[in-house]
Amino acid sequence: MTISNTRDITPELIEAHGLKPDEYQRILELIGREPTFTELGIFSAMWNEHCSYKSSKKWLRTLPTSGPRVIQGPGENAGVVDIGDGDCVVFKMESHNHPSYIEPYQGAATGVGGILRDVFTMGARPVAAMNALRFGEPDHPKTRHLVSGVVSGVGGYGNAFGVPTVGGEVNFDKRYNGNILVNAFAAGLARHDGIFLSEAEGVGLPVVYLGAKTSRDGVGGATMASAEFDESIEEKRPTVQVGDPFTEKCLLEACLELMASGAVIAIQDMGAAGLTCSAVEMGAKGDLGIELILDHVPVREENMTAYEMMLSESQERMLMVLKPEKEAEAQAIFRKWGLDFAIVGKTTDDLRFRVIHQGEEVANLPIKDLGDEAPEYDRPWMEPGKHAPLPASNVPQVEDYSAALLKLIGSPDLSSRRWVYEQYDTLIQGNSLQVPGGDAGVIRVEGHETKALAFSSDVTPRYCEADPFEGGKQAVAECWRNITATGAEPLASTDNLNFGNPEKPEIMGQLVKAIEGIGEACRALDFPIVSGNVSLYNETNGQAILPTPTIAGVGLLPDWSQMAKIGGMQDGDTLVLLGGDGTHLGQSVYLRDLFDRADGPAPFVDLALEKRNGEFVRSAIRNGQVTACHDLSDGGLAIAVAEMAIKSGKGATLDAGDGLPHALLFGEDQARYVISATPEMAKLIALNAEGAGVPFRILGTVGGDRLKISKNVDVSVADLTQAYEGWFPNFMNGELTGNN
């Protein structure tokens, strides 16, 4: 039977495809006629925010993307960074926000699958994963269901595929009630001479479809991810893809085997907008046309239209340009792994994107205008307002600082994430040196005696809401600081920019200023952005999420035997604060969680100080002077030393200095670390800090089973541990909500 590929193009249909009237007018001018239904779908997919970055491209160009170790920056499936000895690390972070809210298990699972494919498409074997998750307030009726589904989906896919989850974040805020965020990160290892790109080369070469069969799942997924949610959200469930990690594992092995055979000219995974996006990107990058014959596409559903095949986001699929003489060898490899292998088209020299179905041409479009030359907007934006200064003396103190510390360390945002990461395989592959729960995840580099990689993912959305510029700087600085706190040298980063509707000038202003802050920090800290993703329209019924520009980074440890952890304190050690005393309580968790206030400015990030203090800490760790190290962030000094006490199972008696106790204990000033060292080493560190111009304070001594800070805090490590470990399992068991 003949499948109908025609449909009348009406204003309603155009609007349903997310195309504005001026964009449709541009299509008419480009092709000189009315588009076919399939062509309308192709334009819709390629010109939406998810694929084209049309609202953010202008600003993304301002980010620093090069450096002495950068082999491949943005524009490919993932970034590539040199780690010496002919090895490189390949990594990226990407969002799967909209699908995960609609169908949490599959949305999160396919988010993990998609980011792993981005990495192994480049020729790298995945070695580490992270995920940064944001959920609504704990007592919202959907939150527990969403947490459970997302965590199960992340674990279900990553564990079965066989990649360790080494880190991540989980936050709760009412601004995510209607739009959760699932940002997935993956990193892989490859050789310099084994990197594969998506740029097609050569005319008349076979275009090959690899992997799983195509079905209707995920049709329109990229378009859905470029729109706000409203009351019709349940109708969007069919646009969520379904993943199979075992097929993906076979695809990984088949691709790496094929790459080693020398058969691959270009390769691209099928992610957002599926066959459309992968074919267009390969052709447009290589200044070639592509002709596809859809009758050759392996399908698992009957009577699929050209539109459905072109826009399906079925998982575990790749598109490749192949050396013709290697066809039989390539096919044998994929058959061995039980995967589909089909020649579905060829490269051409006419820069046209042609799609044939049932002998009929259903699309014939200029390939460059779909890809590189998609519309780009300079959207109007508004400078974000500033919060009035908030001196610590104007912030109320609490009567009982021990109770305040217990409440904060047992709160939704600061409590242990053990419930989450124990559902992930953190040790598979056997190279994990630091698992989640510290400052950064660390894995050994396979085949190298001493080399290791450190990974962290960070952002403080409430800072970004108060001041997108400082918040953007702080996200980069904290990621850099977390990597540094292990002793690793931060090499490069990837950004995942999650914002509301860019058509609103105040939201666009958040995006512009956050990118500006990120760029300034990356330049100052030599931490270039080598890959990334933008997720806009994270709004429901007009309510936007907190601006959340997540930064994930990778660092290099030349010798993992000289590495710091947060739980290494020994009895008799001296604790030293490197960096200034706490003074800043604006936008702090102290203010938010104890007084339900969100006023004051975000903390200022002095990037020169960040660099100086961080480099000093790193050299102390690498010189073997440090037994434990932890950076200071949410909750300031008191939370940092409490976490070190919990992880070490040891108490400490400390003096935080003279001043306002709430600021000294809970101030969130930046560029600070706490280290522990033997008394002799602590003296040497203090002497060196003085010489290097790094502010420091000798805090006190490790020992006993209580944490005592000045005359304000006196609490047992057992009580701290109970509060810290208790909130998440109690919440998921339905025993509490909110900040109880």
Curated annotation (Swiss-Prot):
It is found in: Cytoplasm. ATP binds at residues 53, 92, 495, 532. It holds the Pfam family FGAR-AT_linker. Its main location: cytoplasm. Substrate binds at residues 95-98, 117, 241, 313-315, 535. Gene3D superfamilies: PurM-like C-terminal domain, PurM-like, N-terminal domain. Pathway: Purine metabolism; IMP biosynthesis via de novo pathway; 5-amino-1-(5-phospho-D-ribosyl)imidazole from N(2)-formyl-N(1)-(5-phospho-D-ribosyl)glycinamide: step 1/2. The keyword Mitochondrion does not apply. Mg(2+) 2 binds at residues 118, 269. The keyword Cytoplasm applies. Mg(2+) 1 binds at residues 94, 533. Belongs to the FGAMS family. This is Phosphoribosylformylglycinamidine synthase subunit PurL. The gene is purL.
